[in-house]
From Swiss-Prot:
GO terms for cellular component: nucleolus. S-adenosyl-L-methionine-dependent methyltransferase that specifically methylates the uridine in position 3485 of 28S rRNA. One of its GO terms (molecular function) is S-adenosyl-L-methionine binding. Coiled coil: none annotated. It is found in: Nucleus. This is 28S rRNA (uridine-N(3))-methyltransferase. It comes from Drosophila melanogaster. InterPro entries: Alpha/beta_knot_MTases (IPR029028), NA-bd_OB-fold (IPR012340), Put_MeTrfase-C9orf114-like (IPR003750), tRNA_m1G_MTases_N (IPR029026). It comes from the Eukaryota. Keywords: Methyltransferase, Nucleus, rRNA processing, S-adenosyl-L-methionine, Transferase.
Amino acid sequence: MKTMLAAPTASSNGRPIGPHKSWKKVNEERKALKRQRKQDKLLKELQQAKEAESQAGKAANEVQAKDKPNPSTLSIAVPGSILENAQSNELRAYVAGQIARAACIFRVNEVIVFDDVGIATARETKRSYEADGEGSSTGTVRSSSLQLARILQYLECPQYLRKYFFPLHKDLKYSGLLNPLDTPHHLRQQSKFRYREGVICDKKAKEGHSYANVGLLNDVLVDKAIEPGVRVTVKMEPQSESCRKQRGTLVSPDEPRRETGVYWGYQVRIAHSMSEIFTKSPYATGYDVTVGTSDRGTNVHEVPNRSYNFNHMLIVFGGLQGLESALANDEKLTVDDPELLFDHYVNVLPRQGSRTIRTEEALLIALAALQEKLQPQVADVEIDLTDLLPKSEDSGIAVRRDVLVSKKQKKRKQVEDTPDETVVDEPSFSKPLPKVARLTANPFADSSEELAKNTPAQDDFEVVSSTTVSGTSHSCADDDLSRFD
């Protein structure tokens, strides 16, 4: 009797054989599974983003609680018309360079360039902000003010960033002749200061990050995604041996000065009139102490020391016609006396020898005379940064002491190793005297043979003194002048 074989219930690989599915159904199931996984991933990323945001908020609150107050600031206002008094374009640029140097020497935080001529009395063509790319304001400004502001910004910018922010322009034609500011934030490549100025690069980075050029060999990966071309201040993180990339954190431009006390340059602002100096202040509370300079003001030597207690101080300088002319050309100001606009109206050089003092000269004189009168509410912290921010050594002006000592020791070693040189320590008669070179004949003395050779012949001319000539005078007609033909 034949036996019937049972149908197989499993495949050769051990998997149960189920009902047959079409490829359409299989693809639908795969798409649904893929969609579910993608949705779970998005939910997980959203949850992580919320957690990171909450942690960042807590960290920001903690940092804000620990942050130090910003130090007190010093601002100066200079008229743009001072460039019109220069006789050439080179002198215009040089005057702007003098103002920039004075601002950096006395640690000025803001430079305001204002128009003291006014729109009604301006004779040359105005250029709008939109046409020059300086902003979106509809106001106008004189070309001299624009040139002064542009040169001031150019000199303040670190050298490795100028090509990103300053294209070729006729106002900067002679900027290469100007003296460099050499401020602390103009760092060299070998400087190891933890703060650096940089620009965001157009370079692909991971999400939430971007690359910044801070003047090093390689770009720095910063912690925020910002559009390219923006100037930023980067706090450098200590580089670990395991990480190849240099990382940094974007911070406020005020943080380097607040944390280390180092001077971090100045900001430049343009004011269309004298009134805009006060009304468009970048500080929320405005300027609490204002000082005007004029030869009609109070003697600066009569002002007590440390009497100007300020948080945001402003010093205004006049042009060729003084502050009185700037006040008369401003239509928004109704006062006639400029002394009413300022808290203090001083004469920084009472006994001047010249009838006029140029604005770039008055700037140095005033800032030097007012140094003992200022009392900032929040002073800069004092930290020794000599090793991190070398002054003249970093710019190549002077040589460090260790370099001088090493060169001196090297030279001394070379002298000691010279075999021909003898050094006498003490006078001693027992030691043999050094050999003396034999005396040679005087090379300048004429021998008898040379004198015989030098005896003039009959056809030669001889120059003799007037004492050897006889008293009889000879006329030119009696002499034979044929030899001159």
